[in-house]
Amino acid sequence: MENKIIYFLCTGNSCRSQMAEGWAKQYLGDEWKVYSAGIEAHGLNPNAVKAMKEVGIDISNQTSDIIDSDILNNADLVVTLCGDAADKCPMTPPHVKREHWGFDDPARAQGTEEEKWAFFQRVRDEIGNRLKEFAETGK
């Protein structure tokens, strides 16, 4: 049986979609091929790498990519993680299921370094919890 494809999209493919890709690889096992991309490619955010490392998931070798139409059109599930991606995501064929799981953008966090770091940790955990729920329930 061929693996299902899940494709996470956000604006810059630097934080949220990268963390979602890392969590999905952890939780979805061999059943899914996991990809992430952005409307633009902003590069991997060092704090996203650090936040995931803190929970034992290494995303440092993931790349920041723009949306690949081949992956998009062959995906079983496309998940947008921010309103910008939901609005600007290219049209998908009818057989591709699309869902929106909105999360705050940790790259836009304000305040002290500690406050910004806490923001990254919170969003990381929210994405992780959502992926765990999806892995357990399929929803």
Swiss-Prot record:
Q: What happens when the gene is disrupted?
A: Mutant is sensitive to arsenate but is still resistant to arsenite.
Against SUPFAM superfamilies, the record matches this protein to:
Phosphotyrosine protein phosphatases I
In the UniProt entry, which residues are flagged as the active site? C10, C82, C89
Biological processes per GO annotation: response to arsenic-containing substance
Q: Which GO terms describe its molecular function?
A: arsenate reductase (thioredoxin) activity; protein tyrosine phosphatase activity
Q: Which residues form a coiled coil?
A: none
Quote the record's activity regulation.
Activity is potassium and sulfate-independent.
Keyword set includes Oxidoreductase: yes
Q: Mention any Pfam family matching this sequence.
A: LMWPc
What is annotated about its quaternary structure and interactions? Monomer.
* Function recorded in the entry: Catalyzes the reduction of arsenate [As(V)] to arsenite [As(III)]. In vitro, can dephosphorylate para-nitrophenyl phosphate (pNPP).
Name recorded for this polypeptide: Arsenate reductase
